Amino acid sequence: MKIAIIQFGGTNCDMDVLHVLKDVVGVDAETVWYKEESLTGFDGVVVPGGFSYGDYLRAGAIAARTPIMDSIKKIASEGKPVLGICNGFQILTEARLLEGALTTNEYPKFRCHWTNLRVETANTPFTSKFRKGEVIKLPIAHMEGKFYAEEATLAELDENEQVVFRYVDEKGRLTDKANPNGSLENIAGIVNSSRNVLGLMPHPERASESILGSDEGRKVFESMADYITENF
């Protein structure tokens, strides 16, 4: 098993993800520069956080049009898992691998703090180690994290159980106060219709060891690794 961690100009969470995959979860992982045109030999992809190309035009817009994206789409089409974290989520929506868009926070400022999330489904390659309804704690760090989609798209995401994480309070309740960016329906993460592409704004790699304040994020990577082992 080998997982690719994609690096763009401005990516800054790649080494954190590499550490978690290799040293915490114990799987083979390797960084891949965006100019590469092939991901042959990789069984999964992580598109990490950062500020690719300075968020010019829109967050993720330039990265979504780089050479590596065709290979990421191919990986996804093969059913292999693709995980986009924060800027990675933005890139995946810009590349149309995921529905919706990430726009400027309702209160246009950078938000960096812990959030409570409710796991809406354990039926994905990334959440099999969670329980549906479980409340976990992960940090956010973004200015353009407000999830937006048309009403029909939101209804489809709900109907197909494609919403994976929602912002909640510590008791698991959906409240406006628990929503850090104004995301519609408190959405923090979604999967595609095939369920093998996940994007989320919170950072699981920053909550994968207890010394960081939470180790619940490691389950995202452990679930991903288990899925690859069982299917590829």
Swiss-Prot record:
<keyword id="KW-0547">Nucleotide-binding</keyword>
<dbReference type="GO" id="GO:0005737">
    <property type="term" value="C:cytoplasm"/>
</dbReference>
<keyword id="KW-0436">Ligase</keyword>
<keyword id="KW-0315">Glutamine amidotransferase</keyword>
<comment type="subunit">
    <text>Part of the FGAM synthase complex composed of 1 PurL, 1 PurQ and 2 PurS subunits.</text>
</comment>
<dbReference type="GO" id="GO:0004359">
    <property type="term" value="F:glutaminase activity"/>
</dbReference>
<dbReference type="GO" id="GO:0004642">
    <property type="term" value="F:phosphoribosylformylglycinamidine synthase activity"/>
</dbReference>
<keyword id="KW-0658">Purine biosynthesis</keyword>
<dbReference type="GO" id="GO:0006189">
    <property type="term" value="P:'de novo' IMP biosynthetic process"/>
</dbReference>
<protein>
    <recommendedName>
        <fullName>Phosphoribosylformylglycinamidine synthase subunit PurQ</fullName>
        <ecNumber>6.3.5.3</ecNumber>
        <ecNumber>3.5.1.2</ecNumber>
    </recommendedName>
</protein>
<feature type="domain" description="Glutamine amidotransferase type-1">
    <location>
        <begin position="2"/>
        <end position="232"/>
    </location>
</feature>
<keyword id="KW-0067">ATP-binding</keyword>
<keyword id="KW-0963">Cytoplasm</keyword>
<comment type="function">
    <text>Part of the phosphoribosylformylglycinamidine synthase complex involved in the purines biosynthetic pathway. Catalyzes the ATP-dependent conversion of formylglycinamide ribonucleotide (FGAR) and glutamine to yield formylglycinamidine ribonucleotide (FGAM) and glutamate. The FGAM synthase complex is composed of three subunits. PurQ produces an ammonia molecule by converting glutamine to glutamate. PurL transfers the ammonia molecule to FGAR to form FGAM in an ATP-dependent manner.</text>
</comment>
<feature type="active site">
    <location>
        <position position="205"/>
    </location>
</feature>
<keyword id="KW-0378">Hydrolase</keyword>
<dbReference type="Pfam" id="PF13507">
    <property type="entry name" value="GATase_5"/>
</dbReference>
<dbReference type="InterPro" id="IPR010075">
    <property type="entry name" value="PRibForGlyAmidine_synth_PurQ"/>
</dbReference>
<dbReference type="GO" id="GO:0005524">
    <property type="term" value="F:ATP binding"/>
</dbReference>
<dbReference type="InterPro" id="IPR029062">
    <property type="entry name" value="Class_I_gatase-like"/>
</dbReference>
<comment type="pathway">
    <text>Purine metabolism; IMP biosynthesis via de novo pathway; 5-amino-1-(5-phospho-D-ribosyl)imidazole from N(2)-formyl-N(1)-(5-phospho-D-ribosyl)glycinamide: step 1/2.</text>
</comment>
<feature type="active site" description="Nucleophile">
    <location>
        <position position="86"/>
    </location>
</feature>
<feature type="active site">
    <location>
        <position position="203"/>
    </location>
</feature>
